[in-house]
Amino acid sequence: IKNSIVAGELYQLNFGRTWQGPLGEDPVNIFHRLAINNPAPFSGYIEAADLGLALASSSPEILLETKNGEVMTAPIKGTRPRGSDPDQESLLRRDLVHDKKERAEHRMLVDLERNDLGIVSKPGSVHQSRFDVEAYSNVQHLVSQVRGVLDDGKDGIDALQALFPGGSITGCPKTVVCAAIDELEQ
């Protein structure tokens, strides 16, 4: 990964690891605890007990919203903790907004998502409509909204195919990063 970054082949790669092992409790209880300790507007739980699999997800990020022929994604990149009081919260927020590295990474992600939506949107319709800090129970994030108008013959499924997987969970440029992740997972 580091060599690819130094060579300029990719700019950022978000790499996760798989964990397998005994939980010691029912996975749905873990999901309920996650929902209490890290409430997020987009959460989900799927269990296939016969396969021994469970998936719990909790995210504040909107990958895709479609409505009346318009598409929107709200990428998140840049994080600070919540403050212990309003003054500290404000200081941490200002630090996040003015951090050059965080802003550069966020801008890179917004550009990636603009490009992805551009694949399925009418020419000239894709634009960034919002840039702000959103506060959640434990952290605050830089969040933007990128919007477009679906091109003729395109629908939400086409938009999902263009955006998936989301740039905030892969990195940039997406095709190179996804190939690198595939190689690392072999």
Task: Place the predicted regions along the sequence by residue.
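Extended alpha-helical targeting/anchoring segments
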Residues: 1-186
